[in-house]
Amino acid sequence: MSLASRRKVRIRLYGTNPADLDQVAREIVDLAKKMGVAVRGPIPLPTKRLMVTVRRAPSGQGYHTFDHWELRISKRLIDIEASERVLRRLMTIRVPDTVKIELQLI
């Protein structure tokens, strides 16, 4: 294959459920290895924690009690040297609703 038909693709996965994230990353890596292309990853990126503190009481009367809510966003990074055929196969992978995927051609 010529260099023009092979491109480097950076796949960024992120979501709130780390188990689903790891499953999708494993499927992508297995598919790439089966197709015979070079793979780097999955590289775990730092988990982002979104914290929200809210007051329990609806009015200003009474005790000062608060609830703390947290949302953790986990991220993974995979680099693949892929052709158009491999990219088309990547599009067929079933992805849960908790996982979002970004593809970037480098």
From Swiss-Prot:
Any Pfam family: Ribosomal_S10
Entry superkingdom: Archaea
Role played: Involved in the binding of tRNA to the ribosomes.
Molecular function GO terms recorded: structural constituent of ribosome; tRNA binding
Similarity comment text for this entry: Belongs to the universal ribosomal protein uS10 family.
GO biological process: translation
GO cellular component entries: small ribosomal subunit
Record's keyword terms, sorted: Ribonucleoprotein, Ribosomal protein
Species lineage: Archaea, Thermoproteota, Thermoprotei, Thermoproteales, Thermoproteaceae
Organism: Pyrobaculum calidifontis (strain DSM 21063 / JCM 11548 / VA1)
Matching PROSITE patterns: RIBOSOMAL_S10 (PS00361)
Subunit structure: Part of the 30S ribosomal subunit.
Protein name: Small ribosomal subunit protein uS10
Keyword flag Mitochondrion: no
